[in-house]
Amino acid sequence: MRKQNLIEMEGIVTESLPNAMFRVCLDNGCQVLAHISGKIRKNYIRILLGDRVKVELSPYDLTKGRITYRLRTRSPS
């Protein structure tokens, strides 16, 4: 699939499922089922509950997506 056709959104991980699958609540309130992209898996980046992530969605099926980036959390100061 070409990169232009993907929809990129941000959300929060609400549930961890088997086989590196996660349930993500997007900023617009929708729930999607997302798996980890290959680069995140290759670099051993851990994704935990409550993490903010970027998710790519296909315009053909808006219920499934791919986690492409884990956003940094700001430390309270």
UniProtKB/Swiss-Prot annotation:
One of the essential components for the initiation of protein synthesis. Stabilizes the binding of IF-2 and IF-3 on the 30S subunit to which N-formylmethionyl-tRNA(fMet) subsequently binds. Helps modulate mRNA selection, yielding the 30S pre-initiation complex (PIC). Upon addition of the 50S ribosomal subunit IF-1, IF-2 and IF-3 are released leaving the mature 70S translation initiation complex. Keywords: Chloroplast, Initiation factor, Plastid, Protein biosynthesis, RNA-binding, rRNA-binding. It is found in: Plastid, Chloroplast. The keyword NAD does not apply. Residues 1-72 form the S1-like domain. Its main location: plastid. GO terms for cellular component: chloroplast; cytosol. The keyword Protein biosynthesis applies. Component of the 30S ribosomal translation pre-initiation complex which assembles on the 30S ribosome in the order IF-2 and IF-3, IF-1 and N-formylmethionyl-tRNA(fMet); mRNA recruitment can occur at any time during PIC assembly. Belongs to the IF-1 family. Pfam families: eIF-1a. One of its GO terms (molecular function) is translation initiation factor activity. This is Translation initiation factor IF-1, chloroplastic.
